[in-house]
């Protein structure tokens, strides 16, 4: 599982002209699932993200977690995170999980975050989406398990 995390001041995802999810301060997560991912990896990443201290404290040090600042998450599935561009000019997506497997693990990932008291908004799995954000920092991390 691969997650691109962006600390945001606000973010939204629109599907067919309708806002599917939006947040103020928090994380925009782009979530990719590969074919050999497990529930153990999903839970590890969700727990890691919930506890990451990447928000500034009074001394402007990254010392506060999403829960400390009462932030939210906008989680967007993105199979293209497993695009392989080693050969040719068009990405191959053979490392991305099949949609039924990916959706199940993506939903489990979001559920694990919610179990920790975090509000999680989402896009629509498998849909073409427009994602808008105001990056804060910018702070962008790539997490993989």
Curated annotation (Swiss-Prot):
The protein's superkingdom reads Bacteria
Which compartment or compartments is the protein found in? Cytoplasm
Q: Specify where it is mainly localized.
A: cytoplasm
Please name the GO terms of the biological process aspect recorded for this protein, alphabetically. D-amino acid catabolic process
Q: Place the motif Gly-cisPro motif, important for rejection of L-amino acids on the sequence.
A: 137-138
Q: Which reaction does it catalyse?
A: glycyl-tRNA(Ala) + H2O = tRNA(Ala) + glycine + H(+); a D-aminoacyl-tRNA + H2O = a tRNA + a D-alpha-amino acid + H(+)
Q: What does this protein do?
A: An aminoacyl-tRNA editing enzyme that deacylates mischarged D-aminoacyl-tRNAs. Also deacylates mischarged glycyl-tRNA(Ala), protecting cells against glycine mischarging by AlaRS. Acts via tRNA-based rather than protein-based catalysis; rejects L-amino acids rather than detecting D-amino acids in the active site. By recycling D-aminoacyl-tRNA to D-amino acids and free tRNA molecules, this enzyme counteracts the toxicity associated with the formation of D-aminoacyl-tRNA entities in vivo and helps enforce protein L-homochirality.
On assembly, the entry states: Homodimer.
Q: Which protein is depicted?
A: D-aminoacyl-tRNA deacylase
* Organism from which the protein derives: Exiguobacterium sibiricum (strain DSM 17290 / CCUG 55495 / CIP 109462 / JCM 13490 / 255-15)
């Amino acid at each position: 599982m691969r997650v691109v995390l962006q600390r945001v001041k606000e973010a939204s995802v629109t599907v067919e002209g309708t806002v599917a999810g939006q947040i103020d301060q928090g994380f925009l997560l782009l979530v990719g699932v590969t074919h050999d991912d497990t529930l153990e990896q999903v839970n590890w990443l969700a727990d890691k993200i919930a506890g990451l201290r990447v928000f500034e404290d009074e001394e402007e040090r990254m010392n506060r977690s999403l829960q400390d600042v009462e932030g939210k998450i906008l989680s967007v599935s993105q199979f293209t995170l497993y695009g392989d561009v080693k050969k040719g000019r068009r990405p191959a997506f053979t490392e991305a999980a099949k949609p039924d497997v990916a959706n199940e693990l993506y939903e489990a990932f979001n559920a694990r975050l919610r179990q920790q008291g975090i509000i999680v908004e989402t896009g629509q799995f498998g849909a073409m989406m427009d994602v808008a954000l105001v990056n804060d920092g910018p702070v962008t991390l790539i997490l993989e398990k």
